[in-house]
C-alpha cells in the first residue's frame, strides 16, 4: 500500500505550488480610483476647450404618467 517515491514527489510539488498560489495577494482593488472615474466621465466627442459638447443627454426623459380620466391603462 505504499506509494512510489515519484508519486510522493509529484504530490509534494503540487502541494507546494498550490500553497504558493494561495498565499499570493490578489491585486484587485475594492474601490474605484480617481483616474478611473475621471476617464469615464466624459462623452466621446468631449472637448475641454468647448465644455458644451461634454454634456450628456438624459437617458430617460421625463414623461407625465397616465391620468385616470384618460383611461390609458385599461380602465
UniProtKB/Swiss-Prot annotation:
Keyword Protein biosynthesis in record: no
Keywords attached to this entry: Disulfide bond, Hormone, Secreted, Signal
Pfam families for this protein: RALF (PF05498)
Keyword Secreted belongs to the record: yes
Any one annotated GO CC term: apoplast
Single GO BP term: regulation of growth
Disulfide bond entries: 46-54, 66-72
Main localization, broad class: secreted
Cellular localisation: Secreted
Example GO molecular function: hormone activity
Signal peptide annotation: 1-28
Similarity comment: Belongs to the plant rapid alkalinization factor (RALF) family.
Task of the protein: Cell signaling peptide that may regulate plant stress, growth, and development. Mediates a rapid alkalinization of extracellular space by mediating a transient increase in the cytoplasmic Ca(2+) concentration leading to a calcium-dependent signaling events through a cell surface receptor and a concomitant activation of some intracellular mitogen-activated protein kinases.
Name this polypeptide is given: Protein RALF-like 9
Organism: Arabidopsis thaliana
Gene name of the record: RALFL9
Amino acid at each position: 500500500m505504499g506509494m512510489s517515491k515519484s508519486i510522493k514527489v509529484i504530490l509534494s510539488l503540487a502541494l507546494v505550488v498550490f500553497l504558493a498560489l494561495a498565499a499570493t495577494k490578489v491585486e484587485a482593488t475594492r474601490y474605484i480610483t480617481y483616474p478611473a472615474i475621471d476617464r469615464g466621465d466624459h462623452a466621446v466627442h468631449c472637448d475641454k476647450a468647448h465644455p458644451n459638447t461634454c454634456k450628456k443627454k438624459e437617458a430617460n426623459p421625463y414623461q407625465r404618467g397616465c391620468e385616470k380620466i384618460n383611461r390609458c391603462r385599461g380602465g
